[in-house]
Amino acid sequence: MSRLRIYDDTRPESPLLDTQDGAVIAAELQKIGVTFERWQATAPVAPGASQEEVFAAYRADIDRLVAERGFKSVDVASIAPDNPNRAELRKKFLDEHFHKEDEVRFFVAGSGLFTLHVGDKVYEIECVKDDLIAVPDGTTHWFDMGDEPSFVAIRFFTEPDGWVGHFTGTDIAQKFPRYVPTQAS
């Protein structure tokens, strides 16, 4: 189940809010310009599935979102727990960074933890199958897929290099706990 925890950015041990209520998650994130929606991931795909398999399964959803929002590029992040590069892939986005365009992800299998740093608050969003999240450009954040990553997310971009992270150099991400999935997805 999706989960949101909000913290003061100096108190990682004490959440100000901890909820699994989708309506509350969406409302709280909307306050900071983040879109959170529950969609239906209707075609079964397993973590580690190829981009071609995921595109074939979700072509109608992809085409609709591209048409609605003007995306120019789409790819798939699909990582299974047995991926030999999982530690390297996990480390890639564990430090605070931002993108120069909106970061839009639709989780069609598994889970991962987006952590946003906005003002003096930290928002941990556990995204699971059926979650669509859109993080506005310039929002500082990090992403943790866990020790044994298991997820498939369709990623949407307005520019081909939109996925490139611009790192802030702060150590705030190390002050917050690493991701341990709360459910099997």
From Swiss-Prot:
Pathway: Amino-acid biosynthesis; L-methionine biosynthesis via salvage pathway; L-methionine from S-methyl-5-thio-alpha-D-ribose 1-phosphate: step 5/6
CDD domains: cupin_ARD
Stated role: Catalyzes 2 different reactions between oxygen and the acireductone 1,2-dihydroxy-3-keto-5-methylthiopentene (DHK-MTPene) depending upon the metal bound in the active site. Fe-containing acireductone dioxygenase (Fe-ARD) produces formate and 2-keto-4-methylthiobutyrate (KMTB), the alpha-ketoacid precursor of methionine in the methionine recycle pathway. Ni-containing acireductone dioxygenase (Ni-ARD) produces methylthiopropionate, carbon monoxide and formate, and does not lie on the methionine recycle pathway.
Assembly, per entry: Monomer.
Residues given in the record as Ni(2+) binding sites: 97, 99, 103, 141
Reaction it catalyzes: 1,2-dihydroxy-5-(methylsulfanyl)pent-1-en-3-one + O2 = 3-(methylsulfanyl)propanoate + CO + formate + 2 H(+); 1,2-dihydroxy-5-(methylsulfanyl)pent-1-en-3-one + O2 = 4-methylsulfanyl-2-oxobutanoate + formate + 2 H(+)
Alphabetized HAMAP family for the sequence: Salvage_MtnD
Site (May play a role in transmitting local conformational changes): 102
Site (Important to generate the dianion) residue list: 105
One GO process term, biological-process aspect: L-methionine salvage from S-adenosylmethionine
Organism (species): Stenotrophomonas maltophilia (strain K279a)
Cofactor(s), names only, from the UniProt record: Fe(2+); Ni(2+)
Keywords: Amino-acid biosynthesis, Dioxygenase, Iron, Metal-binding, Methionine biosynthesis, Nickel, Oxidoreductase
Hydrolase recorded as keyword: no
Record protein name field: Acireductone dioxygenase
Site (May play a role in metal incorporation in vivo): 96
Gene of this entry: mtnD
Pfam families: ARD
Disulphide bond pairs: none
EC number: 1.13.11.54, 1.13.11.53
Binding site for Fe(2+): 97, 99, 103, 141
